[in-house]
């Protein structure tokens, strides 16, 4: 039985409040800065109260302010990031799910060897993989394309490993029942594995969507056309703007808008996490 200790509860709540402040203050600071002019932002000390240019900054950023700075509209930057993040998340889940399904439920020569070949890629540094991958993308003519931005990032040894470990916990009785019912591999996957894996898929989707949304190095390498830049690349280019002083008001507006899609994904998928905690899957 857990004892009710008032002091312990107070300390726990204080730690929780402190954690919330540490996480939320940079976002609040960015939002406040997005309501000010660039001169107000760089003039110390910056006020912690909202400024008078909130609607003007967001309107100007959306209707051409960002485009004048980086050569591409804010809407296009957000769209590119959304396409890249969604394609990477879905691609990783589909490929990893099918790979783990084949490794666990099919009997073919060297299947464990293939699994360890996939798993060992986790030990390779990004620098080792990125140069040959870039060479392949150049040879295939995929520079400045969505395929070049997403295809090399779709394979995931981590997701394959997680799906494999989950599939190994599937009771053998379910597999035998499917065989008795004359269910083929596709039907077994559709009717049994997918329903059982929905919370795992939801959790991975959130993680992988954020992973795709925050990509910086790979989009920087494979995009030369500003119209193919993602929101992260756009932010970097605004900060490095050299024709005049950095437009910090647009930078802050873009940063706030860049936060919204990942937050929406987390909020929309949250009930699947709760469902996974309170329900028995098998």
Swiss-Prot record:
Cell membrane listed as a keyword: yes
Residue ranges of domain ABC transmembrane type-1 in the record: 78-269
Domain of life of the source: Bacteria
InterPro entries on file: MetI-like, MetI-like_sf
Signal peptide: none
Topology of the protein relative to the lipid bilayer: Multi-pass membrane protein
Entry GO CC: plasma membrane
Keyword annotations: Cell inner membrane, Cell membrane, Membrane, Transmembrane, Transmembrane helix, Transport
Transmembrane portions of the chain: 14-34, 86-106, 112-132, 146-168, 201-221, 248-268
One GO term (biological process): transmembrane transport
Pfam families membership: BPD_transp_1
Annotated localization: Cell inner membrane
Gene3D superfamilies according to UniProt: MetI-like
Keyword Transmembrane helix: yes
Function: Part of the ABC transporter complex UgpBAEC involved in sn-glycerol-3-phosphate (G3P) import. Probably responsible for the translocation of the substrate across the membrane.
Binding partners and assembly: The complex is composed of two ATP-binding proteins (UgpC), two transmembrane proteins (UgpA and UgpE) and a solute-binding protein (UgpB).
Family, as annotated: Belongs to the binding-protein-dependent transport system permease family.
Protein name: sn-glycerol-3-phosphate transport system permease protein UgpE
Source organism: Agrobacterium fabrum (strain C58 / ATCC 33970) (Agrobacterium tumefaciens (strain C58))
Gene behind this protein: ugpE
């Amino acid at each position: 039985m857990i004892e009710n200790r008032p002091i312990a509860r107070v300390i726990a709540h204080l730690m929780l409040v402190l954690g919330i402040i540490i996480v939320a203050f940079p976002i609040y600071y960015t939002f406040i800065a997005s309501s000010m002019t660039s001169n107000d932002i760089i003039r110390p000390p910056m006020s912690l109260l909202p400024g008078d240019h909130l609607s003007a900054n967001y309107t100007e950023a959306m209707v051409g302010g960002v485009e004048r700075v980086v050569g591409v509209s804010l809407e296009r930057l957000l769209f590119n990031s959304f396409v890249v993040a969604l394609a990477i998340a879905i691609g990783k889940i589909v490929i990893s799910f099918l790979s783990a399904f084949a490794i666990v439920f099919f009997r073919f020569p060297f299947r464990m060897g293939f699994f360890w070949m996939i798993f060992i890629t986790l030990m390779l540094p990004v620098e080792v993989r990125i140069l040959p991958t870039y060479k392949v993308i150049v040879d295939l003519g995929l520079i400045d394309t969505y395929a070049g931005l997403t295809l090399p990032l779709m394979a995931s040894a981590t997701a394959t490993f997680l799906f494999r470990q989950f599939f190994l916990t599937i009771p053998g009785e379910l597999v035998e029942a499917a065989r008795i019912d004359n269910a083929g591999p596709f039907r077994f996957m559709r009717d049994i594995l997918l329903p059982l894996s929905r919370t795992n898929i939801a959790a991975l989707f959130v993680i992988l969507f954020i992973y795709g949304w925050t990509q910086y190095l790979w989009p920087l390498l494979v995009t030369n056309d500003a119209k193919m830049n993602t929101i992260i690349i756009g932010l970097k280019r605004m900060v490095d703007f050299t024709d005049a002083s950095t437009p910090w008001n647009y930078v802050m507006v873009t940063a706030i808008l860049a936060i919204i899609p990942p937050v929406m994904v987390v909020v929309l998928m949250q009930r699947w996490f709760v469902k996974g905690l309170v329900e028995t899957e098998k």
